[in-house]
Amino acid sequence: MSTPIRILGIDPGLRHTGWGVIEQSGARLVHIAHGVIDPPTDLSMAERLGHIFEAVGELARHHAPHAAGVEETLVNANPRSALKLGQARGAAMAALAMAGVSVAEFAPRQIKLSVVGTGTADKDQVKFMVQRLLPRAGEMKLDAADALACAICAAHHLPLQMKRGAA
């Protein structure tokens, strides 16, 4: 039996940053934990980013992942929203880097394809499949489901060296 590899998935957002932790042992995936980071909306932008940074850093310290998968920013019709989302993503990635966690980035389409089988799946389809792939996960918010999907995608795509934190 192989040594379990712990993977943290992050679905970044300024209002809701989803997170999920899984362990991979061979082809088997096991749910460890999931949740959503909700920075208070009355904080300034810098304070919200700091909140995300601190919370993701604490998750990395508590769960000690070997690797992390972070969803890439989808550039949409609103460049201002994409920029703000990118800042939240940067705060999460910086926290992971500070904790010494290897980070891989995945496009939303790649995550959906990896979990659902189609890159055009909607959030409810992703959540449905995450709950099927990780039956012990129980009920979850969509942001947490997206983060777990990112962790599952990372489990499928990361090279073994990165999963183990090797240089």
From Swiss-Prot:
Binding-site positions, Mg(2+) 1: 11, 143
InterPro entries, per the entry: RNaseH-like_sf (IPR012337), RNaseH_sf (IPR036397), X-over_junc_endoDNase_Mg_BS (IPR020563), X-over_junc_endoDNase_RuvC (IPR002176)
Gene Ontology BP terms: DNA recombination; DNA repair
Top-rank taxon: Bacteria
Record's GO cellular component terms: cytoplasm; Holliday junction resolvase complex
Compartment(s) of residence: Cytoplasm
Keywords noted in UniProt: Cytoplasm, DNA damage, DNA recombination, DNA repair, DNA-binding, Endonuclease, Hydrolase, Magnesium, Metal-binding, Nuclease
PROSITE patterns: RUVC (PS01321)
Organism this protein belongs to: Hyphomonas neptunium (strain ATCC 15444)
Protein name per the record: Crossover junction endodeoxyribonuclease RuvC
Cofactor note: Binds 2 Mg(2+) ion per subunit.
The keyword DNA-binding appears for this protein: yes
Catalytic activity: Endonucleolytic cleavage at a junction such as a reciprocal single-stranded crossover between two homologous DNA duplexes (Holliday junction)
Main localization category: cytoplasm
Enzyme class: hydrolase
